[in-house]
Amino acid sequence: MRRTAVFLGLMFAAGTASADDVTLHPFDGTVEDAAFLLESAIVGEGLVVEFTSHVGEMLERTGTDLGAGPSPVGDAQILLFCSATVSRQAMEADPVNVAHCPYSVFAAVIDGETVIGHRSFAEVSMAPVNELLARIVAAATE
């Protein structure tokens, strides 16, 4: 029992030690336009968008059923994709990085402004992923 408590304590401490951030970039256009440019940038990296999550539509659709007010975001789309090369680098450095795959970029209306964003991972082993996400967003916002 004591070993389990110590293990859980260490796991909790490790989980809170590395905070990930979200990097946002303003976008002059619609979420549809931003999502198209993000998809084009992903394809430009030789990758495939595996799934597009229409989070804005889901929040709008379910708000009434939940007794919630207006959606906290306007239109919002999350594009999921993976890179075998980058994933292998990240997971060879730390196999636990499997938890971060697939990777995502998003476009959303937040506080009335369209933004493009992605997670920025704190772990050094995720540096190749951070570089890939930054390249994709840079290509979509240039």
Predicted regions and their residues:
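N-terminal signal peptide c-region/cleavage motif recognized by signal peptidases
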Residues: 13-16
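Beta-strand/loop substructures that line and gate deep hydrophobic ligand-binding cavities in soluble
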Residues: 101-123
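Sec-dependent signal peptide recognition
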Residues: 2-8
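Mid-chain, structured segments of secreted extracytoplasmic proteins
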Residues: 57-104
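Soluble periplasmic/extracytoplasmic beta-strand elements of cell-envelope proteins
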Residues: 26, 78-80, 106, 117
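Stable alpha-helical elements in mature extracytoplasmic
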Residues: 34, 38, 87, 129-133
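C-terminal partner/receptor-binding element of secreted or periplasmic proteins
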Residues: 115-142
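Terminal, regulation- and interaction-focused segments at domain boundaries
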Residues: 18-56
